[in-house]
A protein has these predicted regions:
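Glycine-rich flexible loops
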Residues: 1-233
Length: 233
């Protein structure tokens, strides 16, 4: 890219991150300064929400750039949780954006040490057959980041013990959508637990559903009884 194109692309990413922060508040997935958002810029750096800022007050110029080597650029310091954002983006080339929230039901479950098991087929939208819960570690610590990587593995979401939830995606829209889905699943699972014994789906069925989700909503989704006849009837 030329210098002008690179600058424009960076501006668009910052604007998208600001919009995502505000959307988290609008969707009631976070409150005050809790939680954080990041979006990949390139193979060695990413933009991340600034530390200690109320989401409704974040401006484009507040969004710092952070390199994987720990150097940051901008007028506001990066979120205190920068370590797990960096380590996840570095470990997972398929991930373009990360959302961390303290949404009510997901956090409540995390405070019991529970994850979200295969009680509903939508759990597989994370790319795995369960949503695991990482053990508690102090926020912002390398220990927490290490626990997150060990827990999330190939999934796109996990809970954080006594803390909150992480959701990831190819872009900010996907990460936001998944954060909302995890919160919805957490609420449903909490309600199911209150009703009594919860029936679980087996691993074979969950992996089958996870595979279907890989092409869900796409024109080339696999369905033996459907064939695409063209763009117009």
């Amino acid at each position: 890219m030329t210098g002008a194109k690179t600058e424009n692309a960076a501006r668009e990413l910052r604007q998208a991150l600001v919009a995502a922060c505000r959307e988290l508040t609008r969707r009631d997935l976070t409150y005050g300064t809790s939680g954080n958002v990041s979006v990949r810029r390139d193979a060695e750096s990413f933009f991340i929400s600034p530390t200690g800022t109320v989401y409704e007050e974040i401006e484009e110029a507040d969004v710092p750039l952070l390199r994987f080597d720990g150097r940051w650029f901008g007028r506001r310091r990066p979120s205190s949780e920068w370590r797990f954002h960096r380590d996840l983006l570095r470990a997972r080339a398929d991930v373009g954006a990360i959302v961390h929230t303290h949404s009510r039901y997901a956090t409540a479950l995390a405070c019991t040490g529970r994850g979200i098991p295969a009680f509903h087929y939508m759990v597989a939208v994370t790319g795995d057959i369960e949503i695991r819960c990482a053990p508690y570690h102090t926020f912002g610590s390398q220990e927490l980041s290490d626990a997150v990587l060990a827990t999330i593995r190939g999934s796109n979401a996990c809970l954080l013990g006594n803390h909150g939830v992480i959701a990831m995606g190819a872009d900010l829209a996907a990460a936001l959508t998944l954060a909302g889905e995890v919160e919805n699943l957490a609420q449903q699972y909490t309600a199911a637990l209150a009703l009594g014994d919860v029936r679980m789906l087996d691993a074979a069925e969950m992996w089958k559903v996870a595979e279907k989700f890989r092409t869900y909503g796409k024109p080339d989704a696999v369905d033996a009884d459907l064939s695409h006849g063209g763009d117009a009837a």
